[in-house]
């Protein structure tokens, strides 16, 4: 057709300047040459606990970390300690706490900053002390929380996480907890959990963020996990 239309030079040029075609997702090993010497362990943010750092060698980007334990054993408290630790190390944090109000989350974080358990004994600090601690913790640090009530759809949660990472430069997202996202939906809970985790893990790699995800353990027959039941993985 090009020859018929007198476009012989354009045809020759298109042949000699043709670019290599490669389907999406296929890369040559040489494409990773500049990445191979990067020490991911050396660039990782630490956990607030030394034993975790020894085992996990830090908190890495592009990872999905699951926190699992029985009811009432401190999963949410652990997450608050982690959030405070990340903020104190100048990390930008996103919080999606689906089981409690943002006010309670922020009061708990302020209490950690003041070394007081304000969620149990609010009278440990005056209103002025609480506000002073709040301003000292959040005044020049980045922490965004999802106003979530009425919102328990995994696709919506993924959209908000994407916005946090792209538009707000969030590096770490704490999701507490994944179980509530699938409990309100109909269908095979195991399949929905697998699908939700796949979407979250994909976001970690795509956006270069870490997601710390809390999960309840399925209650076995007899004793619960909080009473010493063994965990089956």
Task: Please give the residue ranges for each predicted region.
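Cytosolic-facing regulatory segments adjacent to core modules
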Residues: 54, 89-169, 183
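Conserved Walker B
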Residues: 178
């Amino acid at each position: 057709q090009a020859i018929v239309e007198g476009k012989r030079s354009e045809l020759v040029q298109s042949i000699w300047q043709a670019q290599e075609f490669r389907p999406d997702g296929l890369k040559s090993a040489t494409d990773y040459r500049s990445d191979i010497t990067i020490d991911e362990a050396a660039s990782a943010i630490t956990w607030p606990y030394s034993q975790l750092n020894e085992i996990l060698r830090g908190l890495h980007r592009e990872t999905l970390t699951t926190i699992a334990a029985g009811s009432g054993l401190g999963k949410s408290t652990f997450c608050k300690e982690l959030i405070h630790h990340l903020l104190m190390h100048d990390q930008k944090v996103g919080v999606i706490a689906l089981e409690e109000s943002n006010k309670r989350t922020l009061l708990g974080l302020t209490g950690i900053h003041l070394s007081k358990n304000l969620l149990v004994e609010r009278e440990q600090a005056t209103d002025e002390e609480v506000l002073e601690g709040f301003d000292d913790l959040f005044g020049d640090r980045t922490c965004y929380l999802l106003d979530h009530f009425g919102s328990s759809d995994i696709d919506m949660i993924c959209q908000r996480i994407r916005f946090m990472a792209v538009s707000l430069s969030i590096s770490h997202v704490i999701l507490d907890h994944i179980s509530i996202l699938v409990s309100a939906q109909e269908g095979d809970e195991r399949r929905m959990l697998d699908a939700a985790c796949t979407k979250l893990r994909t976001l970690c790699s795509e956006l270069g963020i870490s997601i710390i995800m809390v999960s309840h353990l399925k209650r076995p027959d007899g004793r619960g996990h909080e009473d010493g039941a063994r965990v089956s993985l």
